[in-house]
UniProtKB/Swiss-Prot annotation:
GO terms for biological process: proteolysis. The chain crosses the membrane at residues 4-24, 34-52, 158-178, 194-214. It holds the Pfam family Peptidase_M48. Its cofactor is Zn(2+). Its EC number is 3.4.24.-. The active site is at E140. PANTHER family: PROTEASE HTPX (PTHR43221:SF1). The gene is htpX. This is Protease HtpX. HAMAP family: Pept_M48_protease_HtpX.
Length: 294
């Protein structure tokens, strides 16, 4: 119930800001060009801001601590491993962080290849062998080298724009049809504003769910390629061993918003269509077949 209330309030806030910006810029909301411009700004705006703040948000989300100077042998090994792999793929040394969590997990984020972050859980360092941990780190380094964070942002921006634009076009038509378009009597050309808001809200929710299928598909696709990148860096058997170890780990504790960035996604889902990660068995099979290594 709280999520629904927050969604409605957020949508109302977006609608209000949308209207204010349209008024200030003099763009007519009934203009398809104006609506598309605003949908692009709002659609990409949130994604780009999230990307620019991704390192800070990720660290705050998991309570991670960036290693400035290694304090023990484990931290020295971790820093050296990240530095070596970053050099292998030709990227600048990422920041390295550790966060406290019992599950075996790690993630990479950052707005640019040369300004990135790799974070690992204490559960990973305590429960994985060095070879397995090395493979997981290589998986995250591959995400950075492949530019997955930026590509994900672009895809999210496109689907956000689609959802905002199409929802409001249909809502505008519905409000005009059901509420009567009486612009000449002083009412908005959008028709009844309550109908417009209700239809736009419902459609944004429905289209948002459908759009998430696209972003989740890309998230799963990039996991296969990051696994393959790890196999190239440290060897196929090490990556397979790491994935097999993940099968025995705790249910990931990271927030849902972080799942797309982690190597170990949640195992349970209503449908594979909405999973950020492919099933571990499929990832292992893909490595064994060499499907993404070609």
């Amino acid at each position: 119930m709280m999520r629904i209330a927050l969604f409605l309030l957020t949508n109302l806030a977006v609608m209000v800001v949308f209207g204010l910006v349209l008024s200030l810029t003099g763009i007519q909301s009934s203009s398809m060009t104006g609506l598309l411009i605003m949908a692009l700004l709002f659609g990409f705006g949130g994604s780009i801001v999230s990307l620019m703040m991704s390192k800070w948000m990720a660290l705050k989300s998991v309570g991670g601590e960036v290693i400035e100077q290694p304090r023990n042998e484990t931290e020295r090994w971790l820093m050296n491993t990240v530095a070596q792999q970053a050099q292998q793929v030709g990227i600048a040394m990422p920041q390295v962080a550790i966060y406290h969590a019992p599950d075996i997990n790690a993630f990479a984020t950052g707005a640019r290849r040369d300004a990135s972050l790799v974070a690992v859980s204490t559960g990973l360092l305590q429960n994985m062998s060095r070879d397995e941990a090395e493979a997981v780190i290589a998986h995250e380094i591959s995400h950075i080298a492949n530019g997955d964070m930026v590509t994900m942002t672009l895809i999210q921006g496109v689907v956000n724009t689609f959802v905002i634009f199409i929802s409001r076009v249909i809502a505008q038509i519905a409000a005009g049809f059901l509420g009567g378009n009486r612009e000449d009597e002083g009412e908005s050309s959008n028709g009844n504003p309550l109908i417009y808001f209700a239809v736009a809200t419902v459609l944004e929710l429905v289209f948002g769910i459908l759009a998430s299928i696209i972003t989740m598909w890309f998230s799963r696709y990039r996991e296969f390629h990051a696994d393959a990148g790890s196999a190239r860096l440290v060897g196929r058997e090490k990556m397979i061993a790491a994935l097999q170890r993940l099968k025995t780990s705790y249910e990931p504790q990271e927030a849902s918003s972080m799942m797309a960035f982690c190597i170990n996604g949640k195992a349970k889902s209503m449908s594979e269509l909405f999973m950020t990660h492919p099933p571990l068995d499929k990832r292992i099979e893909a490595l064994r077949s060499g499907e993404y290594l070609k």
